[in-house]
């Protein structure tokens, strides 16, 4: 697939690619069906947009974005997991997410922890936040990391907030996420192949 995707990017073709076995959480077939490196690999191809929407509502916006593309291929990653539609703190999230990321759970402007999460890890982060008492936790859905990083610094700071600690949650390799955290222990990623089910 990679050679044809690269040619589509070079040719500025608005192809849409769907990746169905996203994440390491499913896949009784083991590491052959757990694409831990795919997110990073797709993000590094020039002129390719890679979307990893968190729930069904984000997926609808991702489809809109893909259909609006006129000069680059769009890749969307979906999972076989059952993901619930969650409430969004940002009431204008449908527009904000078009800049790559938006706030799902607010916390405050000065959260103790900001969790940057993608796809099924957004719901996982929301559930994890419920288990932590006494902490002000902001959760951000990063549907398009590359697009988010193209935004001006003030927007990025507004989304991440003045958190004492930033944590990343993505079911893939940590490549490209290191700059957001102060310690590797805050990377909830996987830098190895999975195991058989």
Model-predicted regions and their roles:
Residues 53-61, 65-69:
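Conserved glycine-bearing catalytic or ligand-binding loops at nucleotide- and phosphate-handling centers
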Residues 15-19, 49-53, 73-77, 137-140:
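Acidic/polar loop patches that form or flank catalytic/metal-binding clefts of enzymes
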